[in-house]
């Protein structure tokens, strides 16, 4: 006998940056086929406030013939899994829970408490839990956007961003973030779910959208800095890393794709041992290398600092540079010098 059904599917955006709920709706349809009296459906996908009750519940009712909060119930408990993070795993990260009635909310909370060692936080409503999840990623997106904007400004002021941040970080309440590419299926996507809902309510989420605009402009900024250094001469460029974050094989919404487009007049190659090249080539027509041994490049762009790169970056990275070549350090990994430019 199944009491709980958990739905956790991707919630991407479309080409117009609007929520694409197809997978969520399809999953709800499938679940409705097996829905029984008293079942509790828990959604974990990131959505805008109100989505579970406004979109998913009507689908469940329509295709099951059952009535919400009479024959079946719903809850929302957003996933907080951090890919590539070996410290913060499912059981040691606090889980936000919620339910469509007080009794159901307590049952859902009890269910997650049985596996989450860190404990749970029972939100007063499904909409509250939905909003909490989406702003977690919006806050991070905006914080990185601020640092990215400052990095672009400091570039014009001929200041080293890392040194400025290090000095500012000596204050006890300064929040530490680094500039960089913001991709992936969470931070660069979730803000558009809330802005969609905001605009529907005739509210202009200008700060959230401004942060997205800033972060989306980073690939072009980086490409322009590289092209300026090369005097727009057609060059051979290696990008180290393709995934959207360190130590993770996931390349969804990788901003390296945007970066390669901005560098299209050059010979651009990508090396990332964590990526399944055959899988990537199905979606992208990019030049991936299985090995960089004995290869020389005019520019090496350090885009993702996987642990597997550590030894190479420490001992061999310059072996792959031509005599007058340089490194563009997106991740502020190196100390800048004549051959290393930091973002």
Kindly label every feature range from the protein language model:
Residues 1-343:
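Structural/interface elements that position substrates and couple domains in central-metabolism enzymes
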